[in-house]
Regions:
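Compact beta-sheet-dominated domain cores in extracellular/mature segments
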Residues: 1-175
C-alpha cells in the first residue's frame, strides 16, 4: 500500500500543509482546517468526521483546489484512509435483505442500477469476496457513497445512516 496526499489549510494549496502517506484518523491534530488537497499517488477515501466516519468520498490522483465545491463536503476533511491496489478479480455477493437473506446475486463488474439489473429494490447486506468497492445511494453511481473492503456486511443500514439505500456499486480500480 503506497500513496501520498497533501492537505492544505487554505484553498488553492495555500497555507500550512500536512503530508500523509497512509491512514490518518484525525487530520485536525495536524491542521486547523483543510480546504484543498493534492493526491500525488494512490487512491484515498476521505471522510467529513474523524475516525473514518461520516460522509465519504473517493479521491484519485489529481488536484482538488477547492474540494468543498468539487466533492460536495460542507465541512472539512477530518480523516482519510488509503485504498489498497487490487490486481486480481473482483467479486461481491449482494443480498436484498439483512443477514444475507432474500435474493442473492454475485457481482463481478460495475452495476449502475441494482434495481434494473437484478430486480432488487435495494441491497441491504453483502459479502465482499475480492477487491474494493464503492456502493452508491442512487443509480448511475450518484449520491452518497460507502467504501467496502473484503469482508461480511450483515446489515448495511447499521454501518451507514438508517435511511440510506444502495442502488449502484462500482469496483475501485487503479487510477
Amino acid at each position: 500500500m503506497s500513496g501520498k496526499i497533501i492537505f492544505f489549510e487554505d484553498r488553492d494549496f495555500q497555507g500550512r500543509s500536512f503530508e500523509c502517506v497512509g491512514d490518518c484518523s484525525e487530520i485536525a491534530s495536524h491542521l486547523s482546517q483543510c480546504s484543498s488537497c493534492r493526491v500525488e499517488s494512490g487512491t484515498f477515501m476521505v471522510y467529513d468526521q474523524p475516525n473514518f466516519k461520516g460522509l465519504q468520498y473517493l479521491l484519485t490522483r489529481g488536484e482538488y483546489p477547492d474540494y468543498q465545491s468539487s466533492i460536495g463536503f460542507n465541512d472539512c476533511i477530518q480523516s482519510c484512509r488509503i485504498v489498497p491496489v487490487h490486481k486480481g478479480p473482483f467479486k461481491v455477493r449482494i443480498y436484498e435483505r439483512p443477514n444475507f437473506e432474500g435474493q442473492m446475486h454475485e457481482v463481478t463488474d460495475d452495476c449502475n442500477s441494482i434495481q434494473d439489473n437484478y430486480h432488487m429494490s435495494s441491497m441491504q447486506s453483502c459479502n465482499v469476496m475480492d477487491g474494493y468497492w464503492l456502493m452508491f445511494e442512487q443509480p448511475n453511481y450518484e449520491g452518497r457513497m460507502f467504501y467496502l473492503k473484503p469482508g461480511e456486511y450483515r446489515n448495511l443500514r447499521e454501518i451507514t445512516s438508517n435511511d440510506m439505500k444502495f442502488n449502484s456499486i462500482r469496483r475501485i480500480r487503479e487510477s
